[in-house]
UniProtKB/Swiss-Prot annotation:
Its main location: membrane. One of its GO terms (cellular component) is plasma membrane. The keyword Kinase does not apply. Coiled coil: none annotated. Residues 9-28 are annotated as: Disordered. Belongs to the ATPase B chain family. Disulfide bonds: none annotated. This is ATP synthase subunit b 1. It is a single-pass membrane protein. The lineage of its organism: Bacteria, Pseudomonadati, Pseudomonadota, Alphaproteobacteria, Hyphomicrobiales. The chain crosses the membrane at residues 40-59. It comes from Chelativorans sp. (strain BNC1). Keywords: ATP synthesis, Cell inner membrane, Cell membrane, CF(0), Hydrogen ion transport, Ion transport, Membrane, Transmembrane, Transmembrane helix, Transport.
């Protein structure tokens, strides 16, 4: 029976009868609190089993599949995020490697340009030095030629002056004239010593 006899109505009321007093029958207090009565245990256990079964079915068919779906979606999202993070890390590593390679190539190119500039500067400096040296050599040769010309002129003038002076000295000392050819030969002999 689904309803315990303690809950059943004990007295029938007629339709037109009014109650003047409300009260509890004397016999209703003997049993105690209905959930604690042994006579109501089978009914309580039956409803407990039905309620637990319905709750179990509700959890099994409705709540747990939703939770499992949510967990699966979250797991898939986490896996996708991890895959995306791995791809982004690979892309970042590739970008870093490309950057480092380009940087190394730029350094090599800069070193080559600097070396080329140094070599060009050295070559230009050497060419300029050779040009200056050749200019100085030609000026030195011209100067030496002028000096030799001036020296020869001076020496020829000295020779002439020496000849004239020797002629004057001989004329004063000896009182006679000396031959110009012998004076020239004597002066040249002295100059060559």
């Amino acid at each position: 029976m689904f309803v315990a006899p303690a809950f059943a109505q004990e007295a029938d009321h007629t339709a037109g009868e009014t109650h003047t007093e409300t009260g509890v029958a004397e016999g209703g207090h003997e049993g105690g609190f209905p959930p604690f009565l042994v006579e109501t245990y089978p009914s309580q256990l039956l409803w407990l089993a039905i309620t637990f079964g319905l709750f179990y079915l509700f959890l099994k068919r409705v709540v747990l599949p939703r939770i499992a779906g949510i967990l699966e979606v979250r797991s898939d999202r986490i896996a996708q995020d991890l895959d995306q993070a791995a791809r982004m890390k690979e892309d970042a590593d590739a970008a870093v490697a490309a950057y480092e390679q380009e940087l190394a190539e730029a350094r090599k190119k800069a070193a080559a340009i600097a070396q080329e500039a140094r070599d060009t500067a050295k070559a230009e400096a050497a060419a300029e030095r050779r040009k200056v040296e050749s200019g100085l050599d030609s000026k030195l040769k011209e100067a030496e030629a002028r000096i030799a010309l001036i020296k020869d002129t001076a020496l020829s003038d000295v020779g002439t002056i020496a000849e004239e002076t020797a002629a004057a000295i001989v004329q004063e000392l000896v009182g006679g004239k000396v031959d110009k050819a012998s004076l020239s030969a004597a002066v040249k002999a002295v100059q060559q010593q």
